[in-house]
Amino acid sequence: MYRKISFGDFQTGTIGISVKKALIEGPIRFLQKEKQKMGKRLSYESIEASPEIQNWLTQFAASDALAAKSLLSRLEFISRDEYSEWLLKELASLSNQDKSAIYSVRKFDKDDGNGCLWQKDGKIQLRPAQTQGSEDFVSSIISNANRLYNKCFLDHPSLMELRDYRIRNIILVDDSIGSGKRVSDFIAMMTKSKTFMSWWSFGFIKLYILCYARTVQSETYIRKHIAGSDHGQRINRVSSKIQFISHIVYDSYNVHGRWGENLQSILSLCMSYKKNK
């Protein structure tokens, strides 16, 4: 019944995949047509005045229309341009240090490369032929940054390139992080390589995780599941080898703060349509 939105806009008030599935292209087209700015929320007046949104609302039962409007009014839409400008700015600040490697975080199938990011010959696992949505968009920004900043980044390098260039800083880029599992799984695929794991264990590698929006809880999850120890007596503690850089950081448990007084009706709406999808 529902169509997923493209990367063009995402929201920081997520309460689960059911909300994301409730978003389709009508509100997105409206925002793009009106050239809304970063973090723009839809007013009830704009919701009522938009033919695109009114058409979007027809998929809901009349009794659910108010909850659907409440959901829309609490979303914050971020444009592609806004995200791109933020990411390029952050990459510029990191371009002043030694040459770094950049990888766009993506989800792999469990059987890809026996769980390792790199193949046996040291080359990175091939990207799938089908589109990866936001990951493809992030990859295009990375390529642009490399041209702008005098090729100070290695774009998805092999293990041999990491070794030959003596790379010490690795940047992992994502659009937004919820639970942290996708990033954690990606790092686990990196440390699956004995060579990379050796560099990581001896403190030769530092990870920078760049994402526009993330939950407070995701940082805890990623640190907990990454290889190594954060014990105070360890020389190369995990916490000293990983840094998070985000524009928006929010508490995933503060659902009332994000969804307002109509939280319960929004939750009921999402759960109802999740069951019926």
PLM regions and their residue ranges:
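PRPP-associated nucleotide enzymes
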Residues: Y2-K277
